[in-house]
């Protein structure tokens, strides 16, 4: 929050998703110390705290992640049909009140599942391979018209990546860039004990841009940086 409050001229804030752990909707049976109601309370307070440190005129956006979508998907392995009305966080207190302050983007791998702000395209993310940031950047650039000089931002992999240019080959650059903001969650969760989390991290992607699309034929009309939360 201190990092956010120190930023000047913020007009848009985008949460890239997985606001909830959604352990109640996991297909892997387990017992947790917290309940789904606890998650709603924590998420509501967390999003409200973000709004409290940014200018009142800021546009607040939330892109649903796969964990969030698990609570709303019609999948009987996760949530029985008879319970879905009460697990839909958009209609369940204490979270639904806070949700009204945010503009929501669904979890879909198509144009409806991303948010476009000027030359920037944002989504939660879907794949986790080492080159998935670049591959999804190319996919979403195609989905959104293929205009040059755009920046793609996502999360999902939990691995922060600074602004990086896409390449056809090592010697042939493409006119698109990507970055990854990592995760806001735990960096060494128990369920990852047998896997490598050394590249995991929390970060904030900060972008200064010209939003007018008529400027895109002049080249890159944005500057971006990644603020690592451990810095």
Where does each model-flagged region fall?
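Flexible, charged surface loops at secondary-structure boundaries
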Residues: 5-9, 54-56, 114-117, 141-148, ...
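A broad structural signal for short, well-ordered beta-strand segments within beta-sheet-rich domains
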Residues: 10, 102, 219-221
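Conserved beta-sheet core of the metallophosphoesterase superfamily
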Residues: 126-227
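A short, terminal or domain-edge coil/loop segment
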Residues: 64-77, 112-127, 163-173
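Acidic carboxylate-rich catalytic motifs and surrounding loops in phosphoryl-/glycosyl-chemistry enzymes
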Residues: 59-67, 105-111, 220, 225-229
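Core catalytic region of metal-dependent phosphoesterases/phosphodiesterases
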Residues: 1-98
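Structural motif
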Residues: 12, 59, 120-121, 151-153
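Active-site-proximal loop/helix segment associated with metal-binding centers of metalloenzymes
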Residues: 77-136, 183
């Amino acid at each position: 929050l201190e990092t956010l409050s120190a930023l000047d001229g913020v007009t848009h804030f985008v949460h890239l998703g997985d606001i909830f752990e959604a352990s109640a909707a996991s297909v892997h049976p387990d017992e947790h110390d917290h309940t789904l109601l606890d998650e709603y309370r924590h998420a509501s307070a967390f999003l409200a705290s973000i709004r409290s440190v940014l200018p009142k005129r800021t546009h607040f956006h939330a892109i649903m992640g796969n964990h969030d979508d698990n609570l709303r998907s019609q999948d009987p392995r996760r949530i029985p049909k008879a319970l879905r009305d009460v697990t839909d966080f958009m209609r369940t207190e204490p979270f639904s009140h806070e949700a009204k302050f945010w503009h929501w983007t669904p979890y879909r791998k198509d144009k409806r599942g991303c948010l476009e702000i000027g030359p920037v395209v944002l989504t939660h993310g879907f794949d986790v391979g080492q080159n998935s940031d670049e591959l999804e950047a190319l996919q979403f650039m195609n989905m959104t018209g293929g205009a040059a000089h755009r920046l793609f931002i996502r999360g999902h992999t939990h691995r922060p990546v600074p602004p990086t240019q896409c390449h056809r080959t090592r010697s042939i650059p493409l006119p698109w860039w990507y970055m990854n903001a990592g995760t806001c969650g735990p960096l060494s969760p128990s369920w990852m004990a047998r896997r490598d989390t050394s590249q995991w991290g929390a970060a904030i992607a900060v972008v200064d841009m010209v939003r007018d699309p008529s400027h895109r034929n002049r080249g890159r009309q944005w500057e971006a940086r990644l603020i690592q939360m451990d810095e």
